[in-house]
Amino acid sequence: MHKVAIVGRPNVGKSSLFNRLIGRREAVVADFPGVTRDAKEGLMLYHNHRITLVDTGGLWSGDEWEAAIREKAEWAMEGAQAVVFVLDPREGLSAADYEVADWLRRVGKPVIVVANKIDSPKHEVYLAELWGLGFGDPVAISAEHARGLDELLDRVMTHLPADDEDVPEVAPIRISLIGRPNVGKSSLLNAITNTDRAIVADQPGTTRDSLDVEWDFGGQRFVLVDTAGIRKKPDTAIEDYAIQRSQAAIQRSDLIWLVVNATDMGDHELKLANLAYESGKPVIVVVNKWDLVPDEELKRTEKDLNQKLHHISFAPRVYTSAINDYGIHEMLAEAMKLHDKWQSRIPTSELNRWLEVWQMRQAVPNFHGKKLKMYFMTQVETAPPTFAIFCNRADFVTRAYEGYLQNRIREDLQLAGVPVRLKWNEKGPYKRGKKDEDSED
């Protein structure tokens, strides 16, 4: 696997660049120097190449940690094929910058000079001084605004050796964000990707079409689909079209984020919950604007959520604030976990051991003295996990009992949080004759 080290003096934006490239907030970012002291590693994917990035502490900081930080940076250099040397040219080259440059010449690794905090083309006048370092043409970027990153990564790739073998492409997880207008879907998308790809405004219905955004998190590719807000009754032909686009996006997705406004929930949420449930896709309920709920209202808000979303009570919840970036990491981590469960397959032998124990311990439906008997169970599909159960009388299975059984399957068979489907079958070698049934009751 390729390895690239990010170095520079304190407070030039190394950690901001690291976080931007790996797609999550792993390193602590602040406006004062010396925040990062340890070397942090993160995995990113670029054009199907896996690259380990190492974020090092600020070199030549002049504080008590300087020797330890330099030692860790030297360790990071050992396996690196290239070095990204980050500077803030707006402040001019400092003595520490020249010290780092001299050290890099002794190390002897390929160096890409990065001029960070170049937020607009007019700031590129600051780049002239960097030529004097002797590392070639600097790359102008803004880690905060994601400017110039493709050019930087293309430059990095020129210094990395060719892969010995092709890395199998990681299939992306497609996630749709659904919710009624103005619950913060676009703000969440922008917070996740650290971009302004989606238009955000206070007026409901800003997003009229589905918007696909590709992103990487911990080596996993995602395609995030920000759908138009779904109203209970479309006001216009455009709204009607938006609903169709949203429903189509759900069908193309592997997973759904159902975004609700913690401070303003209505009957719309029940409709959306049903829409999500019927799709058979895993659903994560994203309770946005949670920071705006007063402490004394937390229990009541939870009660409202339970009532309006009872149809998908099994779905996990993540409490977020798009404005404060609260809960953003959990949204992606939970999505990866649910996606794995959604595609999982359980051995038939394990299913039938569970079924046997279940019937011994739990009461089953009983009609006029005759009991439901379940003889055999097997998984017939994944995504969602679907199980066929052979029984004596499928008509004995009530909706309430099936829901209860689905919940137990989720809890007992490590499928918590994902939809489960059951197919009842009276045919096959496990079907008993009427005479046999009567004799066993």
Curated annotation (Swiss-Prot):
GTP 2 binds at residues 179-186, 226-230, 288-291. Pfam families: KH_dom-like (PF14714), MMR_HSR1 (PF01926). Keywords: GTP-binding, Nucleotide-binding, Repeat, Ribosome biogenesis. Belongs to the TRAFAC class TrmE-Era-EngA-EngB-Septin-like GTPase superfamily. EngA (Der) GTPase family. InterPro entries: G_ENGA, GTP-bd, GTPase_Der, KH_dom-like, KH_dom-like_a/b, P-loop_NTPase, Small_GTP-bd. GTPase that plays an essential role in the late steps of ribosome biogenesis. CDD domains: EngA1, EngA2. The lineage of its organism: Bacteria, Thermotogati, Deinococcota, Deinococci, Deinococcales. Signal peptide: none annotated. One of its GO terms (biological process) is ribosome biogenesis. Associates with the 50S ribosomal subunit. This is GTPase Der. Residues 2-164, 173-343 form the EngA-type G domain. GO terms for molecular function: GTP binding; ribosome binding. GTP 1 binds at residues 8-15, 55-59, 116-119.
